[in-house]
């Protein structure tokens, strides 16, 4: 008699995805982030569900309802801070996951990569709308500034912005619809994750060498299940340390002031994980140009498969490309720092230089270095 996990229609799918999945024997800890992102998503949906039970999406009571969650609901403070800091963990892992994909050439799995980029956009949209919900000063002004960027779109811009707002400013209608979208998007993300995995399992995982690993595969369980559990353990230690000891470390103090349309905060800025894109947006002194640069800073990921000119898939054996990769990482850190600084000298010029370097590295330096490496290896 066949084992139930191999014959049952539903359990069979789980078996082929997480138990008997043939996996390269040499994948490193950089391959842990997929499962960590899955755990993060589950955690966010769970904590978010409990928060939604006590939250009210109304401009007059939203701020007080969050205060009520933290003060009166049993372990409400824990749920709230796990949700807020869980989002930060989510983005840390997302950026590591994408960085891993770039370093090891995983973007050659075109379907998986493109669905991944769509997932990134969906997660960014969800996080942005979630930041608006507590209805603090930074929530309100962040929503106003970011939605207002759409008015840069020629001809339909203004109509589009007012349509999103549901009025002539960010108000009750905006908050209600943002809550509705913030609630539904994680479930859409979950469905997209399944498609992401479906495409990945069509080809099988990449590995650090970038070479075909069909001749050396091992079952996912128990080898990688135990490795993933260790990753989850480290993640939970990091997350709970953050939640218990400094829950507001990554937040903005301005968001502890209720939203006031008559009082603008001195520095309007998004959460830390959007600062690199915000710096690119601010580095161009033209509204439409800034919006296009902002969009392209993420959309540029779609060009990686086209810009891959090396004969080798992975960067493991390409020291020059490795230098550029780490230069890009340092550049993104500089952009993140600049995004949180006021718009004044010398931050303006540093931001502009870092933005130019970001695009120049990806579009010109990396492909030309790949060609040079081919030449050096007489390929």
From Swiss-Prot:
Residues given in the record as heme b b566 binding sites: 97, 196
GO cellular component: mitochondrial inner membrane; respiratory chain complex III
A GO biological-process term: mitochondrial electron transport, ubiquinol to cytochrome c
InterPro entries linked to this entry: Cyt_b/b6_C, Cyt_b/b6_C_sf, Cyt_b/b6_N, Cytb/b6-like_sf, Cytochrome_b, Cytochrome_b_C_euk/bac, Cytochrome_b_N_euk/bac, Di-haem_cyt_TM
CC cofactor: heme b
Record's keyword annotation contains Signal: no
Keyword Magnesium included in the entry's annotation: no
Residues holding heme b b562: 83, 182
Membrane topology field: Multi-pass membrane protein
UniProt remark on cofactor binding: Binds 2 heme b groups non-covalently.
Chain sites annotated for binding a ubiquinone: 201
UniProt KW keywords: Electron transport, Heme, Iron, Membrane, Metal-binding, Mitochondrion, Mitochondrion inner membrane, Respiratory chain, Transmembrane, Transmembrane helix, Transport, Ubiquinone
GO molecular function: metal ion binding; ubiquinol-cytochrome-c reductase activity
Regions crossing the membrane: 33-53, 77-98, 113-133, 178-198, 226-246, 288-308, 320-340, 347-367
Gene3D superfamilies: Cytochrome Bc1 Complex, Chain C
Pfam families reported in the protein's UniProt record: Cytochrom_B_C (PF00032), Cytochrome_B (PF00033)
Locations listed in the record: Mitochondrion inner membrane
Recorded family membership: Belongs to the cytochrome b family.
Other facts: Heme 1 (or BL or b562) is low-potential and absorbs at about 562 nm, and heme 2 (or BH or b566) is high-potential and absorbs at about 566 nm.
Subunit record text: The cytochrome bc1 complex contains 11 subunits: 3 respiratory subunits (MT-CYB, CYC1 and UQCRFS1), 2 core proteins (UQCRC1 and UQCRC2) and 6 low-molecular weight proteins (UQCRH/QCR6, UQCRB/QCR7, UQCRQ/QCR8, UQCR10/QCR9, UQCR11/QCR10 and a cleavage product of UQCRFS1). This cytochrome bc1 complex then forms a dimer.
Function as written in the Swiss-Prot or TrEMBL entry: Component of the ubiquinol-cytochrome c reductase complex (complex III or cytochrome b-c1 complex) that is part of the mitochondrial respiratory chain. The b-c1 complex mediates electron transfer from ubiquinol to cytochrome c. Contributes to the generation of a proton gradient across the mitochondrial membrane that is then used for ATP synthesis.
Full protein name: Cytochrome b
Source organism per UniProt: Ctenomys tuconax (Robust tuco-tuco)
Gene this chain is encoded by: MT-CYB
């Amino acid at each position: 008699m066949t084992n139930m996990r191999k014959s049952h229609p539903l359990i069979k799918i789980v078996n082929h995805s997480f138990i008997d999945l043939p996996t390269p024997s040499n994948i490193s800890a950089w391959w842990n982030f997929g499962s960590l992102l899955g755990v993060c998503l589950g955690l966010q949906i769970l904590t978010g569900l409990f928060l939604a039970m006590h939250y009210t999406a109304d401009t007059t009571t939203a701020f007080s309802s969050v205060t009520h969650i933290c003060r009166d609901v049993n372990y409400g403070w824990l749920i709230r801070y796990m949700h807020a800091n869980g989002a930060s963990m989510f983005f840390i892992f997302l950026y590591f996951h994408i960085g891993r994909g770039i370093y090891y050439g995983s973007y050659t799995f075109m379907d998986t990569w493109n669905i991944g980029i769509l997932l990134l956009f969906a997660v960014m949209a969800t996080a942005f709308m979630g930041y608006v919900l507590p209805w603090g000063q930074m929530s309100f002004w962040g929503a106003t500034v970011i939605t207002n960027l759409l008015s840069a779109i020629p001809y339909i811009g203004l109509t589009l912005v007012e349509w999103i707002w549901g009025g002539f400013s960010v108000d009750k209608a905006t908050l209600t619809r943002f809550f509705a979208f913030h609630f539904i998007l994680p479930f859409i993300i979950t469905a997209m994750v399944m498609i992401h995995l479906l495409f990945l399992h069509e080809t099988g995982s990449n590995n650090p060498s970038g070479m075909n690993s069909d001749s050396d595969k091992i079952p996912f369980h128990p080898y990688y299940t135990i490795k993933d559990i260790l990753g989850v353990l480290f993640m939970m230690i990091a997350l709970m340390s953050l939640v218990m000891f400094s829950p507001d470390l990554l937040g903005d103090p301005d968001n502890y002031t209720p939203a006031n349309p008559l009082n603008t905060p001195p520095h309007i800025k998004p959460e830390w994980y959007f600062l690199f894109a915000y710096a690119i947006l601010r580095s161009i002194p033209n509204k439409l140009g800034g919006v296009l640069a902002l969009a392209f800073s993420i959309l540029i990921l779609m060009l990686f498969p086209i810009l891959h000119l090396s004969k080798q898939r992975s960067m493991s054996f390409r020291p020059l490309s490795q230098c550029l990769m780490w230069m890009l990482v340092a550049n993104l850190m500089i952009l993140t720092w600049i995004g949180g600084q006021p718009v004044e000298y010398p931050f303006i010029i540093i931001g502009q230089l870092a933005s130019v370097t970001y695009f120049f590295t990806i579009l010109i330096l990396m492909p030309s270095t790949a060609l040079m490496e081919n030449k050096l290896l007489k390929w």
